[in-house]
Structures are given as structure tokens and as C-alpha cells.
Amino acid sequence: MKSITGALRAAIGQRAKERPAIEPLPKSRRIDGKVCLVTGANSGLGKAVAIDLAERGGRVLMACRSGHPEAGEDVRRRSGSDAVQMLKVDLADLASVHRLCDELRTTTPRIDIAVLNAGLMPRQASQSKQGFELMFAVHFLANRVLVGRLLEDGLLRPADAGSEAPRIVLVSSETHRGAEPIDFDHLGAFVNYSFKDGLKHYGQSKLTQCTFAQELSRQLNPAGETRVAVHALCPGPINSNIAREAPLLLKPVLAPIMKAFFLSPAKAALPVTYLCCSDAAGERTGLYLHMMREKAPAPEASDPQNGAKLWSASEALLRPHAPGTS
């Protein structure tokens, strides 16, 4: 209960201190014809991002576990765009991620913008299909596989002279700052915990995710240029479905607090849209935004040694689960 109360207090404090330093993009900013992949786009923040990108002229691919086909129909209706398609993926199953990538390879010429948004905080400890801690698997490992395949299959193409850099935007969280250091000796290992410890493990998964974002930026832009723009952000506290796993007794308490003090998904989508569509974000890499303000991520996430260690350790974790291995 203490962790939940602390999280609510922090979220309300974030709203009270909110002073945007970056202006939201005007609706006149267009991305006509750009292919945009958005994970977790069936509700909440992901759905708001999908609507915004579709309104701006993007061809939006909504990669979701559920919400088929009604979420896609709603995005089409609210954006006024028919260039919206739903794709099936379960990010808790690496085989499902590979199936999505196989489908994209045969149906999609390229990905210009990838928004890795899907997230969750389960009521109690859960395992992914391959036996990893669930939040580690969804927030980091699935994204590691997805990005790797998009690059390997030639859908995410690093820019050369005269071409525009594709963008990868990871939706993370300020909870990464208070997380314990990454345990490389037990990376991704399932541990049993209850809901009251969920926020702690959520923060650990987000530290891993932020570390990945910084290392991915270094790996793809080794000479300091921007061939692929890789960014991460915390959108702030959102009135969305991420608290759907809260105990039933808490839901009547949480609902009015979230409605009063948390951001609507549409407002929380503003920094995501900025990183996806602005000229400035396309010319740089490695940005981290907290709502509409640029900040440095936690030192642990920015540390190149941590990044390199995570890269090699996760590569070893994934090897037994590559397609064609038993």
C-alpha cells in the first residue's frame, strides 16, 4: 500500500510542477505517407498516439494483443484516416514478436517511425511465455527482438546522405531513477512478488529499458551522427489502463484520483508526437523527455559500460529463443 500511495503522491507532484519547456507540435505538422508502427495501441496512450499520427497523414500499424478489430475502427473514425491497420502480437511471447516481424517483412516496405509503447504492471508476479519476469520481457526483451528484426530485415534503414533518419521512440518512466542497479547475474529471472512490490519491479524494468534506449542510440550512431534517431520519454502520470490490475478494493479509490490529477492520454501523447514528428528530434539521437521537458536519464541508464553489458547479456539470453532453435 505504501508503494501505491508514494506513486500517487509523486504523480500529483509531477502535475503540480509541470512547466512545459517544449512547445507541442501544431496540428499543421504533417508526416504524410510515413509508416508508423505503434505497440500497445489498442487503448490509453498508445491509442492516442495512433490517432495523432494518423491525423497527421501517417500510415499507422497498430501492433496489439487485444482490441481487434474495434480499436482500429475507432482510430480510423476519430482520425478520419483509412490508413490504419491492426496487427496481432503478444509481447510476452518472443515467438509472437518474431511472427509479427515475419508479417511486416512480407507486407511493409519500410518503417519510418516505431513507437514502442506497450506496457503493464501486473497485480502479482507473472512469467512471460519463455519464463522471464513479465515486465522485463514486455518492456525490454520484446523491444530488443523487435528492433533487431526491423533492422535485420531492412525495414528500419539507417539514413545515408540526403535521406531522413527513421525514428525509434520508447515510452519509459521516471520510476527508472529510483530503481536498484540492473542485476546482470540474474537478468530477467522470474522472482515472486505481490502487488505492493510491483512498482519496484516496474521501475527496474524501466531502468533496463532506458539503458537499452541509450545503448541502442550509441550502437546505431557510432560516429555521433544521426542515422537512426533513438529517443525515450516518460509521458507523466496518465489516466489509462495500466492500473487495471490494481486490487478490486483499491479501484474505487484510484479512479477519481487518476481522473482528477493524471493526464488524459491525448495530452500525455504530446511528447511522443514531438519525438516522432518534429524536425529537431529527427536531427538528434539519445534524447530523454519527461513530459514536455528535456532531461538527462539516470546516470545508470546513460553509463556506456552498463549499456554494453546489457547488450551482450541480453544477446545471450535471446540466443536459445531465436527462430529455428528448439
Where are these regions (language model features)?
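Generic recognition of well-ordered alpha-helical segments
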Residues: 215, 271-274, 313
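Rossmann-fold NAD(P)H-dependent dehydrogenase/reductase core
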Residues: 3-8, 14-244, 317-326
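C-terminal helical subdomain
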Residues: 97, 205, 232, 256-297, ...
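C-terminal tail/cap regions
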Residues: 2-20, 250-251, 280-326
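Short interface patches used for recognition in eukaryotic signaling and trafficking proteins
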Residues: 58-60, 85, 255, 295-299
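Residue-level detector of alpha-helix boundaries and kinks
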Residues: 120, 131, 197, 253, ...
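Mobile gating loops/cap/lid regions near enzyme active sites that modulate substrate access
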Residues: 246-248
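Juxtamembrane interface at the ends
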Residues: 185, 251-255
